[in-house]
Amino acid sequence: WYLSQEISRRTKNMSRIYAEVGRHAKAVSGGLKTMISPYIHGIKTDQVMAGDKALSVEEHRREWNEILGNVAGAVDILAFQDGQVDYHELYDYLVVNKALADKYGMECWTNIESFDRDMPIKFLPIKFDKLRMKLEAARRAGYDRPSRSNFRIS
């Protein structure tokens, strides 16, 4: 099951609803796994581009420790989107996400965005060197299960 409502620090009270939905999905499906794919409130979020402050790695760790504590047992897979932070910060966030997932007994995937947020036209395909850098950062942080995000604009 993919619980698709993206939660973040602004909507962290949704985590209790997530827990209920996750438990319900497991109950009606015979215990199938549930997954969330939230975003990191980094420098490339729309809110930060509009003047909000990006979360530091430590602030991210504190906020997501609380959120994941609320959903522990109801969410099995944590797959943070990786496109909302700068490339030089990505590894640090990946390490924190992996440690939090391990703490709460969740599988940890990275949701590798295959479009480029660094371009003024949203969202062009990412250059291969950037994609490779993301994959390498995930590998160094101990991830063995990347997934991919892609939007089709018509």
Residue locations for each model-derived region?
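Glycan-processing catalytic domains of CAZymes
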Residues: 2-154
